[in-house]
């Protein structure tokens, strides 16, 4: 169901501070960041660090916050189309640098590979669904063309104006997740880009809460319909969050 637009620009700074902390905390927590909400708030609003926090988690949180601000700046320029260059730059900023992943295979063999920041995947990636089946995302060979097609589809849809913003965000989220263009960080980038679409369309940004992680991941893994519902559900929740500030 289409939501009423809210003039988010006129909302007070305290709302945006609250949103920034909630978004950074929940989006990174879904991916395993261990910072508490209080530690996140202390870091992002007061530039202070809790002595018990892990350095990797702190750096990851700060990088996500930079990405959030990049996304907001890009969304504000409604004359500028979405580009793959921006998507890759967002990913490069999020990951900060290339890093090596070490794994032990079932037979005990050690293997490793490099995750590249801001570069489309060079290795196949997949997920085990709730039913135990393996779902293969787009291959590395297919990914560049699919991302070009996705970005063009979004820009064309905005130009044509025949689709609601929530529908557009939902379908973009679905198509992006099916591609999984990067070797790491796909979930965080997907949520940032959904919010880019919503914000540019005059809607409040959404937050997938970390305590809804299982429902979120099940929706991603279960069906086309459920994947499409995620931005709509998030929009409903964020509209409720905005009410105290209006």
Question: Across the structure, where does each feature detected by a protein language model lie?
Answer:
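FIC/Doc superfamily catalytic core
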Residues: 1-184, 188-246
């Amino acid at each position: 169901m289409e939501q009423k637009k809210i003039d988010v620009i006129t909302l007070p700074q305290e709302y945006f501070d609250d949103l920034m902390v909630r978004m950074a905390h929940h989006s990174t927590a879904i991916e395993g960041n261990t910072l508490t909400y209080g530690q996140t708030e202390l870091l992002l609003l007061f530039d202070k660090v809790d002595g018990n926090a892990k350095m990797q988690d702190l750096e990851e949180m700060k990088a996500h916050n930079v990405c959030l601000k990049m996304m907001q700046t890009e969304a504000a320029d409604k004359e500028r189309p979405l580009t793959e260059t921006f998507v890759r730059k967002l990913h490069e900023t999020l990951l900060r640098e290339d890093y090596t992943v070490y794994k032990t295979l079932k037979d005990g063999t050690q293997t490793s590979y490099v995750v590249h920041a801001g570069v489309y995947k060079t290795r196949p990636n997949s997920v085990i669904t709730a039913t135990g089946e393996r779902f293969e995302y787009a291959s590395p060979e297919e990914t560049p063309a699919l991302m070009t097609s996705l970005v063009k589809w979004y820009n064309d849809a905005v130009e044509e104006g025949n689709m609601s913003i929530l529908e557009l965000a939902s379908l973009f989220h679905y198509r992006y997740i099916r591609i999984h263009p990067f070797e790491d960080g796909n979930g965080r980038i997907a949520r940032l880009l959904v919010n880019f679409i919503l914000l540019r369309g005059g809607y409040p940004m959404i937050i997938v809460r970390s305590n809804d992680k299982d429902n979120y991941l099940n929706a991603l893994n279960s069906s086309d319909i459920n994947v499409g519902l995620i931005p709509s559900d998030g929009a409903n929740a964020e509209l409720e969050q905005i009410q105290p500030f209006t």
